[in-house]
Every structure is written in structure tokens, then in C-alpha cells.
């Protein structure tokens, strides 16, 4: 419920910001802002099922007509059901159970961006560097096991912003790969240096 409420608030804020922007001819190309829905496919041994439970927020400022620096934060949750099996909790303890695994990722940091074309269509390439908080959890029977992890985060991205409307609000689409150094173990299953492929679609300002 908290995730859904957060998404509604973020979308409402984005629409209000776009409505209050000046006419397109007056929009400054010295900065950019994105609010995106995110589809994510994790690459790790703990959770590997794709989901659309994520969002991304970007802001940046152009140092030259082509090169920008900025900041980002995003979050994503991926879930996976695991059939019944014997899980060794310790050297002397084991349990036979199924699991509902969940992986929540929250990366944030700085962005370096190169804008290929400065026009209504603005394709770009970017590199994001920062830190990632990842929360691993597993529900079984009426119990829950979890682990908090931190790591270094890196993500190359390719995308495009399109500004078709007179109010200066546009559309944003991007594809990305991400990698982090997070490492954790829950219910005997290790997650070591997880990666992700994903796609973002949202609003650009």
C-alpha cells in the first residue's frame, strides 16, 4: 500500500510540474528532469523474475550544450516463489519448506550524461555511479528471514527524450544495465554482486 501511495504522489507531482512549466519556446535546455516507471529483470541467484514494481527519478544540469552532470535515485522490488525443498539453515538445522523471496533495491548517486542531439528529440548516453542499498527477505510458513546489504553501484544507460508539446513537458524512454557489489545470504541462498537489465518509460521536463 505504501508503494502504491508513493507512486500516486510522484505521478501527481510530475503532472503539476509539467503543467506549470513555461511555453516550449521559453523552456531552458540547460537542465533536465525525469520521472519514470521502471521494468527490471534481475540477474542473480537469489531472485531472477522480472517485475514492473519500480520508479526512477533523475535531474541534471548541462555544463556544455552536450555534457551534463546530475543526480539520481530509483527503487525496485522483485519477487520470486521457490518450491518446497530442504533448506540448510545451519550445519545442524534444516527445514523443508517453500519460500516467497523478495529483493528490494535502492540505488542513488551521480550521473554523467552526453546528449547526442539538441532538438525536440534528444538521444543520449549516460553513466550512473553511486551506492545501492538492497534488502533481501524470504517468507516461509509464518516466519521471515532477511538481510540488509550495501554496495557500490554502476549503470550505463541509453535513452531519448522527446518534447512534442507546447508546454515543454515531454516523454522519456531508456534502457539500462546495472551492477552492484552487494553481497548477502538469506535461507542458505547467497546473492553476490547482482546485476539488472531494465527499461524506463516516463515524463521529461
Where are these regions (language model features)?
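Cleavable N-terminal export/targeting peptides
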Residues: 1-28
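Transmembrane beta-barrel outer-membrane domains
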Residues: 46-52, 99-105, 145-153, 190-196
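Outer-membrane beta-barrel pore domains and translocons
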Residues: 34-42, 74-76, 128-132, 176-180, ...
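Outer-membrane beta-barrel translocator domains and adjoining extracellular loop/strand segments
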Residues: 43-51, 81-88, 135-144, 183-190
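Predominantly the C-terminal beta-signal and adjacent terminal strand-loop region
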Residues: 77-84, 96, 159-205
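Residue-level detector of the transmembrane beta-barrel scaffold of outer-membrane proteins
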Residues: 28-34, 68-70, 124-126, 170-174, ...
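Short glycine/proline- and aromatic-enriched beta-strand/turn motifs that initiate or cap beta-hairpins
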Residues: 21-63, 68-69, 204
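Gram-negative (and chloroplast) outer-membrane scaffold detector with strong preference
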Residues: 58-140, 151-154, 162-167, 205
Amino acid at each position: 500500500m505504501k508503494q502504491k501511495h508513493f507512486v500516486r504522489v510522484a505521478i501527481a507531482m510530475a503532472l503539476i510540474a509539467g503543467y506549470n512549466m513555461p511555453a516550449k519556446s521559453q523552456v531552458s535546455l540547460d537542465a533536465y528532469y525525469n520521472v519514470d516507471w521502471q521494468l527490471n529483470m534481475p540477474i542473480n541467484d537469489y531472485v531472477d523474475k522480472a517485475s514492473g514494481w519500480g520508479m526512477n527519478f533523475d535531474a541534471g544540469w548541462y555544463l556544455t550544450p552536450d555534457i551534463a552532470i546530475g543526480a539520481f535515485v530509483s527503487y525496485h522490488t522483485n519477487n520470486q516463489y521457490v518450491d518446497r525443498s530442504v533448506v540448510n539453515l545451519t550445519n545442524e538445522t534444516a527445514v523443508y519448506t517453500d519460500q516467497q523471496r523478495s529483493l528490494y533495491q535502492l540505488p542513488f548517486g551521480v550521473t554523467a550524461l552526453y546528449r547526442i542531439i539538441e532538438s525536440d528529440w534528444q538521444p543520449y548516453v549516460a553513466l550512473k555511479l553511486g551506492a545501492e542499498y538492497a534488502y533481501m527477505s524470504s517468507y516461509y510458513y509464518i516466519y521471515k528471514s532477511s538481510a540488509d546489504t550495501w554496495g557500490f553501484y554502476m549503470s550505463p544507460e541509453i535513452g531519448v527524450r522527446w518534447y512534442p508539446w507546447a508546454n515543454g513537458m515531454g516523454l522519456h524512454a531508456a534502457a539500462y544495465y546495472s551492477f552492484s557489489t552487494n553481497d548477502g545470504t538469506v535461507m542458505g541462498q547467497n546473492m553476490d554482486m547482482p546485476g539488472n537489465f531494465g527499461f524506463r518509460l516516463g515524463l521529461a521536463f
